[in-house]
């Protein structure tokens, strides 16, 4: 039996069992409303789209011609019209995503007006936009399904091929597609990152993109003056996002870990190393330093630390930031972690076309 007819039959039984209270209810109308509102919450959307994105990632790993396209949208209406146009042209929404960049949100969605891409816009601007986009996409579903319901009524009245119309309804493809949502650098520490990630997931995001810049000194990825955080800080924020996904029951949610290390020449702090080769030691190895052979050469407030059995002084700018060695950016893109005797080398995405997903199991 058609799924549509099963819904009608089920609601007809419910009407009978509810007696007078449902006396004015038309079971077929109710079935249509349910089909038009398939996704009741943002979490329903996040779980549904996460499974799509994971399948697409697996397909791409097996065949790189099966790539996806993520098109930027700054309003629910533009997303709606974009997906309706894609579906009309391609007869499918497969491998078509919506991309919400922090740059775009800062420029077009802040109550403060157009802003540079420096995390100065409201924290909830992205989660609000996610909810808005999915509201418009659900509206597109309701609109197209209504046309099919009208076609069904007209076909019945004319004695036409009802089964053909029922097949269209049963195989209707939703306009709900995955959204890749940019959380910038998390808008604060790992706790702030976790709280904001929850808001974004609850709004429907199955994929969150995060970068390794200092949150309160964040710059657009195409600008100079970028300041990165130590590896431990970035991994803590990635895990915070993973915890948010797990808590909300979106276990296969995707995290896009993006680095600005290639173009960033500064760090705000020097992490404390506990043993040679740990994450802090790896990070500090890229600092621009000079050997210290005589304590009298140190100035007021200078700091030194031990590196490879010698004392070195990191190069500190007048603003208190520390510089990395010239040409070390490409090496800083990757790091090695060794949790419980397992070693994993992680290379973070440099730019949109090379973004990779990082799962919490990797560390």
How should each PLM-predicted stretch be described?
Residues 2-363:
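Alpha/beta enzyme core
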